[in-house]
């Protein structure tokens, strides 16, 4: 995403200052205050640390990408559509039980729609389903241990059933796939796996993973268009700020690979 945003210089000729915070809200607030001292014209926010209400108080054009954005403009993937596509494919492939693996996402976060769409689609088609939101951890190893625990539970709870596993991102999907290969030396016919994001790990996995692809280039372009419109308006003699935040959703693309029929 960052690469796509930075490449927009040739179109808009705006220079970028990039800050990455790792130590919470206080550090991020300090960074933003430093940025404001540089008299920046606008801000693109990808982190989830500060609420959109806090961000809106800075009184500069702001666009959020894939995060809570009640009080500021935003661009997101249509997470509901992506999860609907993934869930529908697993249903078409005649899985006996559908399982969604995720963290416990707050409802205000766009990615929550992946959970909502999975649940509503399973109910609509009257397909048995299981939602596991217990993934946690800050390191790769901690998360892998959680995925291993969930894999063991699924193996014990759903023997002799074809299992359709929809994971919230490609990293989780790759972990789950590797655990299957460690046990079975292959992807058995009673497992199907779908990830989300179309990150490089999905195509580079031991078996290329079916995934819901986010159109990162379009998301970045749309975010820049939204931000530039607001910044240009601010330069007018009598600027007219947005009456309310603008929220745009970009359609995802289901990319079928080797982990589904």
Q: Where do the protein language model's features map onto the residues?
A:
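Short beta-strand elements in bilobed, periplasmic/extracellular small-molecule ligand-binding domains
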Residues: 9-20, 119-144
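Hydrophobic alpha-helical segments within soluble ligand-binding/sensing domains
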Residues: 71, 75-100, 116-120, 142-152, ...
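Flexible loop/turn connectors
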Residues: 152-164, 168-261
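Short, solvent-exposed amphipathic alpha-helices that sit
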Residues: 1-11, 82, 110-128, 175-179, ...
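Short, well-structured alpha-helical segments in soluble
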Residues: 25-39, 143-161
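Periplasmic-binding protein-like
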Residues: 32, 39-46, 99-102, 159-169, ...
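Alpha-helical recognition/docking segments in bacterial nutrient-uptake
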Residues: 1-88
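An alpha-beta-alpha
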Residues: 86-132, 239-259
């Amino acid at each position: 995403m960052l690469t796509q945003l930075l490449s927009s210089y040739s179109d808009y000729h705006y220079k970028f200052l990039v800050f990455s915070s790792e130590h919470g809200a206080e550090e991020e607030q300090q960074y933003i205050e430093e940025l404001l001292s540089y008299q920046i014209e606008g801000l693109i926010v990808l982190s989830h640390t500060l609420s959109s209400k806090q961000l809106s108080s800075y009184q500069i054009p702001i666009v959020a990408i894939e995060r809570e954005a009640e009080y500021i403009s935003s661009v997101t993937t249509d997470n509901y559509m992506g999860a609907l596509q993934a869930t529908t494919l697993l249903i078409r492939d005649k899985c006996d039980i559908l399982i969604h693996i995720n963290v416990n996402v707050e409802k205000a976060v766009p990615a929550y729609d992946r959970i909502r769409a999975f649940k509503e689609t399973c109910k609509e088609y009257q397909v048995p389903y299981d939602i596991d939101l217990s993934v946690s951890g800050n390191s790769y190893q901690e998360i892998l241990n959680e995925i291993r625990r969930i894999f063991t539970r699924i193996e014990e709870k759903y023997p002799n059933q074809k299992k359709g596993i929809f994971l919230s991102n490609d990293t989780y999907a790759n972990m789950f796939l590797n655990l299957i290969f460690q046990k079975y030396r292959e992807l058995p016919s009673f497992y199907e796996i779908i990830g989300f994001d179309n990150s490089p790990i999905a195509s580079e996995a031991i078996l290329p993973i079916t995934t819901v692809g986010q159109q990162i280039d379009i998301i970045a372009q749309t975010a820049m268009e939204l931000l530039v419109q607001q910044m240009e308006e601010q330069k007018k003699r009598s600027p007219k700020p947005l009456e309310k935040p603008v929220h745009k959703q970009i359609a995802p693309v289901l990319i079928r690979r080797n982990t589904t029929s």
